Regions:
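Short glycine-enriched nucleophile-adjacent loop
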Residues: 175-184
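Gly/Ala-rich beta-loop-alpha elbow adjacent to hydrolase catalytic centers
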Residues: 167-171, 175
Length: 395
């Protein structure tokens, strides 16, 4: 990463914590730290030593098998561990909980930087379908991971040090939620909250007193064609970042452009604005049961492929598209428009699904008389063709 190559030699006493540092800490949260003795109540380990342990425990072949967009996180941490800026940072209190039955995925880690701060980083969404469903369930009220995030911050945020809270994707949502819901003695020491393309919240939360107490400490960053970061309500004005990727692939923060210690600014695309407005207007006019049904419908389509990740859905191409089309036919027509908008944003081959669904609808809407006429016409055509073939054989 260019930032570490050009500025990694600068300690925090030489150059203060900035927005790019926040994003780097979010990458640390994506690394699997199981078995490295940095769990809750275990050691505090310097990042340099942590990285060494990680690459002893995990082979290059194992890491190469990871096809998710977070696959580069261990290598980013390795670069951080080799820099003056981060190598002596202390890592601790790593937790990781996954329960598909409860649609729960929660992970967090603490980093103590040499500027005297405690930094709590929440893992976001990789491209696992279960994790993405939890993202969308955020629109239905509190999810288990949010409650765990506030409990985590209360447990490990004790002391006198200044606190930063951050995360990418769902991790950004958890960072904001935890900062708003934590104990007042912890909340008073929070200097900054960072949400990197994190989804928003239900209306009741963003209008609550607890949210308003930390609202002016929230920094929100989204790429120029953001999808996840535009979900639900988020009163904080975002800084829009130029990305080298397209569509949902912009959610990969490795595509975000950086210049010095800052992100490169851009304007929000029309597609991002349109999708946000469409979903917002629709969600405002339906009840909680309809919202739940919408989320279930969307993910029943994705899960019909039989794979675990969005990467695998895309790699399956038309085979997976066919499975999804069959599932789409089972969906109540009232949600088709909104489902199609999301599928178009997420999957490159979704046009096939929408065309296939529309052709089916068109066939279903053909009047019986027209269908009968077509059947008679086809029968007569086949009869005439057979008659010609018989004449040719006689000759």
């Amino acid at each position: 990463m260019d930032y570490l190559k050009w500025r990694g030699d600068l300690t925090f006493s030489q150059d203060a914590f900035n927005e790019v540092d926040n994003l780097l800490l979010s990458f640390v949260a994506y690394v699997n730290l199981e078995g490295l003795s940095v769990g809750a109540g275990e050691e505090r380990v310097a990042l340099e030593e942590l990285s060494r342990r990680f690459f002893v425990l995990h082979s290059e072949e194992e890491l190469a098998a990871d096809k998710s967009f977070t696959r580069l996180a261990p290598y980013i941490v390795k670069m951080m561990a080799q820099s003056n800026r981060y190598r002596t940072s202390l890592i601790s209190n790593y937790v990781n909980m996954v329960n598909p039955q409860l649609e729960l995925q929660f992970s967090a880690v603490q980093l103590d930087l040499m500027d005297g701060s405690k930094n709590f980083c929440f893992r976001g969404t990789d491209d696992n379908i279960v994790a993405w469903k939890e993202d969308f369930n955020l629109g239905l009220g509190e999810v288990p991971a949010q409650k765990l995030a506030s409990e985590y911050l209360n447990r490990f945020g004790v002391g006198t040090s200044p606190i930063r809270v951050s995360g990418h994707s769902k991790g950004g949502n958890l960072a904001v939620y935890a900062a708003a819901a934590c104990k007042i003695e912890v909340q008073e020491r929070i200097t900054d909250v960072y949400s990197n393309d994190g989804p928003g919240f239900v209306h009741e939360f963003v209008t609550s007193d607890s949210y308003k107490k930390i609202q002016n400490r929230i920094h929100r960053y989204i790429p120029d064609s953001s999808i996840i970061g535009m979900l639900l309500e988020n009163p904080v004005e975002p800084q829009v970042i130029k990305s080298t990727a397209k569509g949902i692939l912009q959610h990969d923060a490795m595509s975000w452009q950086i210049e010095g210690p800052h992100f490169v600014s851009a304007s929000l695309s029309e597609s991002a604005i349109s999708l946000h407005e469409t979903l917002r207007n629709w969600l405002e006019n339906i009840d909680e049961n309809a919202r739940t049904q919408f989320v279930d419908d969307l993910f029943s389509i994705l899960e019909s492929t039989g794979v675990d990740t969005l990467t695998q859905v895309q790699e399956g191409g038309l085979k997976n598209a066919a499975a999804m089309l069959r599932e789409l036919h089972q969906i109540v027509p009232g949600t088709w428009s909104e489902l199609e908008n999301l599928l178009k944003a997420v999957l490159p081959f979704s046009g096939f699904l929408i065309m296939g669904r529309q052709k089916t609808v068109d066939r279903q809407n053909i009047p019986r008389a027209v269908t009968s006429h077509r059947a008679i016409h086809t029968s007569n055509k086949n009869h005439n063709e057979n008659k010609v073939k018989q004449e040719e054989k006689r000759k």
